[in-house]
Design a protein with these regions (language model features):
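A short, surface-exposed interaction/processing loop segment used at functional sites
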Residues: 100-128
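Cysteine-rich micro-motifs
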Residues: 47-54, 84-92
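Structured alpha/beta or helical-core interaction and ligand-binding surfaces enriched in interleaved
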Residues: 24, 34, 39, 54-57
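Short, charged low-complexity linear segments at domain edges
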Residues: 1-9, 45-70
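Short cysteine-rich clusters marking metal-coordination/redox-active sites
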Residues: 25-29, 87-89
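Short cysteine/histidine-rich metal-coordination sites, predominantly Zn2+-binding motifs
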Residues: 40-52, 102-111
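Short, non-ligating residues that shape and space the ligands of small metal-coordination modules
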Residues: 32-35, 93-97
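Short, flexible, mixed-charge glycine/proline-rich loop motifs
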Residues: 10-22, 75-81
Length: 128
């Protein structure tokens, strides 16, 4: 496991593993990462409305909705993607991908740390 320093936190990285690339946690760098939700935003350039598709792996639900305005779309003008997940060190995060003028912009959002309350069998999210 590679621990990230303050400057590296939030950066989306991959490590080489037997000819494949493994996504690491954008917060701490741990390589055991699980994706729990995918959100896709389909929008024609500068259109007012877009289609938002959500596949929630933990809840076993898929939703499709028409949205007026930006909603959660990470792109202000076009299509976007948000992957939500966690690492086995407990970090919760989102990875956003947005299109802008031919570029694909990638950023992550730290959502807090999973805290296990084994006495009450609960999982709580704690921010930094």
């Amino acid at each position: 496991m590679t621990k990230k320093n303050e400057e590296e936190r939030g950066k989306v990285d991959f490590i080489d593993a037997s000819g494949e690339q493994l996504l690491t946690c954008p917060e701490c760098g741990f390589e055991y990462v699980h994706i729990t939700k995918a959100e896709v935003f389909m929008r024609g350039e500068d259109e007012d409305n877009h289609t938002h598709v959500t596949a929630d792996i933990e809840d076993h639900k898929t939703e499709i909705e028409k949205v007026k305005g930006m909603g959660r779309n990470p792109s202000g003008r076009r299509d976007g993607l948000i992957l939500t997940g966690y690492c086995e060190e407990g970090c919760n995060f989102e990875i956003e991908m947005a299109q802008h003028k031919g570029n694909t912009i990638v950023k992550s959002n730290y959502l807090g740390k999973k805290v296990y309350d084994w006495a009450n069998w609960q999982i709580k999210i704690r921010s930094r």
